[in-house]
Amino acid sequence: MQPFNGAKLALLCDDALLVYQRDVKPEIPWPGLWDLPGGGREDDESPERCALRELQEEFGLVLEEDRLTWGRCYPSLQPGCLPSWLFVGRLSCVEIASIRFGDEGRGWLLMPVAEFLAHPQAVPHLQERLRDYLSQCVQG
């Protein structure tokens, strides 16, 4: 398996996206911005397991790998650093209702996809990666 830094999840429920607002701490990347579930790799886990473990830690949701319908590895934004992954999947209303938000972040919500893509306080490279996925859907 190729080394990677971490993985994020774009989880859709109808036309909305599961997002959370990052803590406002100067020592973390993208403080206060709207972000997607996910985070850094631990040990030798696969990209899928990394994303799903982070989802469980951050939102209390347990999904199986077969719920991920799309994935792509993206080069790092910083030269010399490892790449990261974006996966896409769907959530049901029942799963949304069962969310138990963890202790990282200021809060979560289901944000309309179009709003996330245009939001001035969303993590910019995740907006671009979500656009990449959506363009694949239109072309596919």
Where are the predicted features?
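N-terminal strand-loop-strand
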Residues: 1-35
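Active-site-adjacent beta-strand/loop module that shapes the phosphate/pyrophosphate-binding cleft
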Residues: 3, 13-15, 72-98, 109, ...
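Short, charged, solvent-exposed linker or helix-capping segments at domain edges/interfaces
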Residues: 96-102, 119-123
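A generic structural signal for short hydrophobic patches within well-formed alpha-helices
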Residues: 41, 116-117
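The catalytic Nudix box helix
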Residues: 36-69
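Functional cleft and adjacent loop/helix regions within the main domain
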Residues: 33, 43, 103-105, 113, ...
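Residues that flank catalytic or metal-binding motifs in active/ligand-binding sites
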Residues: 5, 32, 83-85, 104
